[in-house]
Amino acid sequence: MTKNLLVELGLEELPAYVVTPSEKQLGEKMAAFLKENRLSFEAIQTFSTPRRLAVRVTGLSDKQSDLTEDFKGPAKKIALDSDGNFTKAAQGFVRGKGLTVEDIEFREIKGEEYVYVTKEEVGQAVEAIVPGVVDVLKSLTFPVSMHWAGNSFEYIRPVHTLTVLLDEEEFDLDFLDIKGGRVSRGHRFLGQETKIQSALSYEEDLRKQFVIADPCEREQMIVDQIKTIEAERGVRIEIDADLLNEVLNLVEYPTAFMGSFDAKYLEVPEEVLVTSMKEHQRYFVVRDQDGKLLPNFISVRNGNAEHLENVIKGNEKVLVARLEDGEFFWREDQKLVISDLVEKLNNVTFHEKIGSLREHMIRTGQITVLLAEKAGLSVDETVDLARAAAIYKFDLLTGMVGEFDELQGIMGEKYTLLAGETPAVAAAIREHYMPTSAEGELPESKVGAVLAIADKLDTILSFFSVGLIPSGSNDPYALRRATQGVVRILDAFGWHIAMDELIDSLYALKFDSLTYENKAEVMDFIKARVDKMMGSTPKDIKEAVLAGSNFVVADMLEAASALVEVSKEEDFKPSVESLSRAFNLAEKAEGVATVDSALFENDQEKALAEAVETLVLSGPASQQLKQLFALSPVIDAFFENTMVMAEDQAVRQNRLAILSQLTKKAAKFACFNQINTK
């Protein structure tokens, strides 16, 4: 016979960004708890609103499965003394398992007998295990927590109710000074406290109190309501996935509605209006059928449709205040002079240990000079890049960006166009922030891409130089994201810029404001980001590519992909083993690896030397790998007929030199002795 378990925790309003991860965590930890306690179940469903986290287990076994465990103890010769009596070692072993020496049996393993005991544990009824759900709730982790009411404990928010039901049976459990039962809270304004009748009636009991506990159902309600408004008004409404997820975690009973604002505000840049609505007010944007922004918005109230006209007016009033600010800053910022703002950046601190934003821009400008040549920018592109680098942070001192910091770069583009700068300069100012997340949009223009790389590289090198290096999960200055951005942009544009050579060039630069330090740490940090970009590539293949001598990001990613592609083919293992043997022996070479043909003693030696001399890796990675694997028979013949470590030192070094030249060329692809072929 199976049962159904419900656990609900009622809390003060949770931050929207915490709700979904906490709901998921609760489900995962409940599943782990049941598995650990040998309780089978059919399904787990989680629930969440801003004021509750809940989980329901259906088809739950009514008792634990019985447990039979075998334990291996000491060898028989240690377990028995000369008289055949059990020693203290044997007695202590069984006592630790809660058994006696009568339970001992001997089993033979590889010719020797050992003590074994079998422990059997009869499963308990599920009712005896349910109180352990309190520990599940205690084990939840949150990004922030708080104390309340003078208590010593802390949690994400104050706890008000705990509901634990096994079918209709309630459990009177204690959690953070709250006594459990079957009482839950309805909607803050429309509902009231209610008794949950059973684990299976949970959603319906709360629905009567204007709470939709299932977030998927709430989401669908919001989408359906928006689609209805869309059809009735003949408009297009952008349902942004991130905004939708946030809104559904702000409401327990959603009702969507349309509001409006004065069309005069449409003269303000669209990005300002969209930011005001989406980022600040959590409104959905409304457009006409051609995609043109309309003076309307969609909001979702936490409640029903009663007195909705008052709610609409209130939301419109709040938005207008935001739009007034945007209109004011748009008008006033156009009176500012870009060069004046750039000069004022001398007084804006980039970081107290590093210097001003203006100094950061100057260093970035010098880096762009190096990158422009390596990226093959045209003369016109180089001119635009220099101009963009000279002014690209100016918009940080505009009123608009001061009020709406999400618009940095975006407003820079608009203000530079108004000031008569070229579209390429304006676009680069917007694009230099890209990507803004791990999978974020990348720059489209070469000028913007180079400026983005240069800005990020100076940021990384500057922070590393003053010892502000990320450790563990701690990365307050988002240096991992910046490095990932550099790597992604280089790969996307296919620029064959060797990162080790580039970093060497940057460390050779001289600045009045800062001296770059900690180069080795920077290189390791960049390699770690390339490693991350390789995704699920096997660890040994990653290590082989990263240990190679080619640090062109696009080449490294292509090499890793090519190795994975052929790793299941028949010739992969023998080819890699041949190259690995060459790599391992080449490490013994001394001095400059020059080959003297006069010292050859067999045809196989000569054949390998000639093959290595004519080897030029070219084309895509898959083709280069075929070139290297084609050497496998020649390498094998060399090893079968040649004593590499000959007694004659000159002969030995000559043979090591052949292998050294081979591995030097192969290392441009990967260090094959890092690949596991077992």
Swiss-Prot record:
<dbReference type="GO" id="GO:0004814">
    <property type="term" value="F:arginine-tRNA ligase activity"/>
</dbReference>
<dbReference type="Pfam" id="PF05746">
    <property type="entry name" value="DALR_1"/>
</dbReference>
<comment type="subunit">
    <text>Tetramer of two alpha and two beta subunits.</text>
</comment>
<dbReference type="GO" id="GO:0006420">
    <property type="term" value="P:arginyl-tRNA aminoacylation"/>
</dbReference>
<keyword id="KW-0030">Aminoacyl-tRNA synthetase</keyword>
<dbReference type="GO" id="GO:0004820">
    <property type="term" value="F:glycine-tRNA ligase activity"/>
</dbReference>
<keyword id="KW-0547">Nucleotide-binding</keyword>
<dbReference type="GO" id="GO:0005829">
    <property type="term" value="C:cytosol"/>
</dbReference>
<dbReference type="InterPro" id="IPR008909">
    <property type="entry name" value="DALR_anticod-bd"/>
</dbReference>
<keyword id="KW-0436">Ligase</keyword>
<keyword id="KW-0067">ATP-binding</keyword>
<dbReference type="GO" id="GO:0005524">
    <property type="term" value="F:ATP binding"/>
</dbReference>
<dbReference type="Pfam" id="PF02092">
    <property type="entry name" value="tRNA_synt_2f"/>
</dbReference>
<dbReference type="GO" id="GO:0006426">
    <property type="term" value="P:glycyl-tRNA aminoacylation"/>
</dbReference>
<protein>
    <recommendedName>
        <fullName>Glycine--tRNA ligase beta subunit</fullName>
        <ecNumber>6.1.1.14</ecNumber>
    </recommendedName>
</protein>
<comment type="similarity">
    <text>Belongs to the class-II aminoacyl-tRNA synthetase family.</text>
</comment>
<keyword id="KW-0648">Protein biosynthesis</keyword>
<dbReference type="InterPro" id="IPR015944">
    <property type="entry name" value="Gly-tRNA-synth_bsu"/>
</dbReference>
<keyword id="KW-0963">Cytoplasm</keyword>
<dbReference type="InterPro" id="IPR006194">
    <property type="entry name" value="Gly-tRNA-synth_heterodimer"/>
</dbReference>
